[in-house]
Design a protein with these regions (language model features):
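Short beta-strand->loop
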Residues: 22-55, 68, 124, 158-184
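"Short basic amphipathic alpha-helical interaction patches in structured regions
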Residues: 21, 76-80, 106-111
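Short amphipathic alpha-helical segments and helix-helix/interface helices
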Residues: 14, 82-85, 135
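Pocket-lining segment of extracytoplasmic ligand-binding domains
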Residues: 89-184
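Extracellular/periplasmic catalytic domains that process cell-envelope and extracellular macromolecules
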Residues: 16-19, 53-57, 86-88, 118, ...
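A residue-level structural signature of the nucleotidyltransferase/glycosyltransferase Rossmann-like core
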Residues: 5-6, 61, 92, 145
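Beta->alpha turn/N-cap motifs
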Residues: 2-15, 19-21, 26-30, 131, ...
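A conserved helix-loop-strand patch within extracytoplasmic ligand-binding domains
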Residues: 28-101
């Protein structure tokens, strides 16, 4: 189809084509104040906040909602217990399409590393057309877990009750139960 001297591609596409191109620049974004791969560290009763520091990556999270199952999983994590595949497979998941880094690919890799299974192996995974659809499903109890970029609560905490149907503040109804490695 032709050639280009410069192009903008995702980190995932770079991995696929790294033999054919070089990195000249990389994107930066504002970091958030929570960066641990331990989900319990994210559940301190405060919503993640943007910082003045720049970061070359972000993380994907597994966010448990206010449903009975979501709160059961969150309680296990906050008590220092390891989640099992059966724990996760018995939940209803809201996921993005299979090309989404934070909404599918990295959570699938996280599952693969821990359980030898991926999102495709889950009994109850529902594909959402947007993160706001996933948030609505989470708030209403249609989903127990959603996968998303790590700063989703920073972006949507103010809308949790009014737009998504939450019955309490987002920080009180959700919690992080899994955190992926950095997405570049």
């Amino acid at each position: 189809a032709g050639s280009a001297d410069i192009g903008f591609i995702s980190g995932g596409n770079y991995v696929l084509f790294s033999d054919d191109c070089d990195v000249l620049l990389t994107a930066l974004r504002y970091a958030i104040n929570k960066d641990s791969e331990n989900p319990k560290d994210w559940n301190d009763g405060t919503i993640e906040e943007n910082t003045d520091e720049m970061s070359t990556y972000y993380r994907s999270i597994l966010l448990a909602g206010p449903s009975e199952k979501g709160q059961e999983l969150l309680a296990k994590v906050n008590n220092g217990e390891e989640l099992t595949w059966d724990d996760l497979n018995s939940a209803t998941w809201a996921v993005m399409g299979p090309t989404s880094a934070s909404g599918y690919i990295y959570p699938a890799l996280w599952l693969q590393e821990r359980y030898g299974k991926t999102i495709a192996d889950l009994d109850n995974a529902v594909q959402s057309d947007s993160y706001t659809t996933s948030l609505s499903r989470l708030a209403s109890g249609q989903a127990d877990i959603m996968v998303s970029y790590g700063h989703i609560r920073t972006k949507y905490a103010a809308d949790w009750k009014e737009k998504f149907g939450g019955t309490d503040d987002m920080v009180n109804q959700t919690g992080v139960i899994g955190v992926t490695e950095g997405i570049y």
